[in-house]
Amino acid sequence: MLLAQRRLISLGCRSKPIKTIYSSSKVLGLCTSAKMALKFKNAKRIEGLDSNVWVEFTKLAADPSVVNLGQGFPDISPPSYVKEELSKAAFIDNMNQYTRGFGHPALVKALSCLYGKIYQRQIDPNEEILVAVGAYGSLFNSIQGLVDPGDEVIIMVPFYDCYEPMVRMAGAVPVFIPLRSKPTDGMKWTSSDWTFDPRELESKFSSKTKAIILNTPHNPLGKVYTRQELQVIADLCVKHDTLCISDEVYEWLVYTGHTHVKIATLPGMWERTITIGSAGKTFSVTGWKLGWSIGPAHLIKHLQTVQQNSFYTCATPLQAALAEAFWIDIKRMDDPECYFNSLPKELEVKRDRMVRLLNSVGLKPIVPDGGYFIIADVSSLGADLSDMNSDEPYDYKFVKWMTKHKKLTAIPVSAFCDSKSKPHFEKLVRFCFIKKDSTLDAAEEIFRAWNSQKS
């Protein structure tokens, strides 16, 4: 046994030495743990990537009394036929076993049919489509399969937060270009007001540029890139022989007056583009974690190599159910009841409600043209953040304060920025509106009570 001496200090008392007895095995264990921690520290490829906005803010929203407009998941019900197809699949014995590693045959066939119509070209279900563990898995496959250490990858700011760490884990260098808002002169502020400078974008291309990551409709802004903007990007990709990884998970969620254009359909782009889609966003089933990549066989085969040596395959009954759900809506694509048509109509009403609500309490929302998020400038609320961590950006402090004191949560927009750009976005927070009316009612109550306290 080992003896150690400590001093006990208490208010109003003189300190006295006390003896603590430690077992030698405990001391040895502590020393061994310290050595092990030093020896088996993190791999360099994940250095500095341990902070994650979803881990941090999902914990805050776990309190059932908090109205959660933060993380982007629906609390509305998915279509009944989607759930019914999953139930059917679960009762078919061979649907509970492994399926084809690159995508369940019925699902890749359905995706080939759907996107063949959209692209107006034949898409080989086995060679030009890869089903992965969500859009995250599709992004990971794309970056690991196509990007080398030392390559540069262009990312527009703000960006979905996993882009930068995935690029860094591949040993590549992210090169950032900001989307900037045009002056609005007090008029309605929309995601269309945010764009890039074509000359500035061209200046980011170099001999080291391997790829550009595009996100349309955009998260968090809700921007739907115009054909003209996409043509600028496409021309630069062709000129500099650059890949395009196009994250289009919100492709069906586009609102009145706007059209989603796939950059892969522009001249010279099919052969250099990986387009990523999501079952979670298409059918409001984010917990299914199914995504897909579509592109030419000479690119998809490298993504397949990553997948076969990592995720290997995705859940068979989920893929089988998704295939059947797609066939139901493929057959009625011109029908208002088709979920690809009915969901954006439903969400546009919710979006407009959120815009009115945010305006009514003195906030300045950026009206999204697509997706299911709305950003608002919260600086006018004048919240007292003195009890928050002073080292954090304003939006982090604000959301934590709002969650604690108002029982309403959102996501800080600076989480979607590189370190240099964070100060330009830290007065903005992102709200999710793919929620039941009762959830939005509760949020409205909180905002109205808050506003009445100010006046």
From Swiss-Prot:
Cofactor(s) of this protein: pyridoxal 5'-phosphate
Involved pathway(s): Amino-acid degradation; L-kynurenine degradation; kynurenate from L-kynurenine: step 1/2
An annotated GO cellular component: mitochondrion
CDD domains tied to this protein: AAT_like
Regulation: Kynurenine transamination is competitively inhibited by cysteine, glutamine, histidine, methionine, leucine, or phenylalanine.
Sites bearing N6-acetyllysine, chain numbering: 117
Tissue: Widely expressed, with higher expression levels in liver, kidney, heart and neuroendocrine tissues.
Pfam families recorded: Aminotran_1_2
Subunit structure: Homodimer.
Protein name, entry field: Kynurenine--oxoglutarate transaminase 3
Name of the gene: Kyat3
